[in-house]
Amino acid sequence: SLVGSEMCIRDRQSIGEMKSFYGNFTVIVKALTYVKTLGREGIPEASQNAVLNANYMMNKLKDLYTMAYDEVCMHEFVMSLADLKKKTGISAMDIAKGLLDNGIHPPTMYFPLIVEEALMVEPTETESKETLDEAVEVLRKLYEIAETDAEQLHQAPVTTPVTRMDEVGAARHPYLRYEWQD
């Protein structure tokens, strides 16, 4: 029996082993697989779900967080945490790190660049209402923590295998290669 890359190379159903020479070809294969899996009816439904999910979350959060663009959105919405930072010292980075402590992958931070303390939230089309509600609840809880115990968020994440790194130190003194132990 064949294992690993041997199976890819020798299996007549396979496209073969992928090499870096082909650039983003694997991304195209994944996209094609996604399109073929969803089909003609599934693509519009997935798109509608992405838009619905983003608008649902945005409307559940806009009473606390400042929306950069407070109007119906497409598949993403942008929050500005500039007011929260001025009031509490908690940045978009702190909220993102707090999300990690709660088992949620953080949204895109500091983009778009024209929005101060931006968090760009893109809930995917496959998220259930329950997971969206959980994310909203966590974001609301983090806002409350920002107002009552900012230091807790400045220390986050504390439950992940790798805790918050010294970003200034990492930028000024980069460690770019691993030293193997003999």
Give the positions of each predicted feature.
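PLP-dependent aminotransferase class I/II
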Residues: 19-32
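Short hydrophobic/aromatic-rich motifs at helix boundaries and adjacent loops
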Residues: 5, 29-31, 68-69
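Short, small-residue-biased leader/transition segments that mark boundaries at the very start
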Residues: 2-9
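Non-catalytic terminal extensions of PLP-dependent enzymes
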Residues: 11-12, 35-182
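A structural-propensity feature for long, helix-poor, extended segments
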Residues: 14-17
